[in-house]
């Protein structure tokens, strides 16, 4: 299961790079994947790369898997990409190298903001579907900070006149 992608929400999948390799094209097509978010470190760019640019729409993010990497700045972009795909009837695969830390953090952030969930609840929700997730401590801290950020934005939106 760790080397395969799992459907976290209808149309939103999380997995390792191996689930997006050339040999997995039939599986991607079977699941109806139309968009792929590829999260990798700069040093991984030679072997973790978009394999099907002619078939899928890609968002490629070069993000280090270390506790001091600022991932919050990428959340709005990834949410817009996922929302755009799902609203047009598409399906999205979010992958990193192993599908355990970076890519899981982005899926958790998406679920938190989309459904107004707290970090702990969103983490548990994703882990029920992809058991092997294990975020680095810095990403956990940033997701906990992000909870306060998006909840404050939500409060402001609710208080604003139409």
Predicted regions and their residues:
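Cysteine-based protein phosphatase catalytic domain of the PTP/DSP
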Residues: 1-94, 98, 106, 113-154
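Intrinsically disordered, low-complexity regulatory segments in eukaryotic proteins
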Residues: 160-162
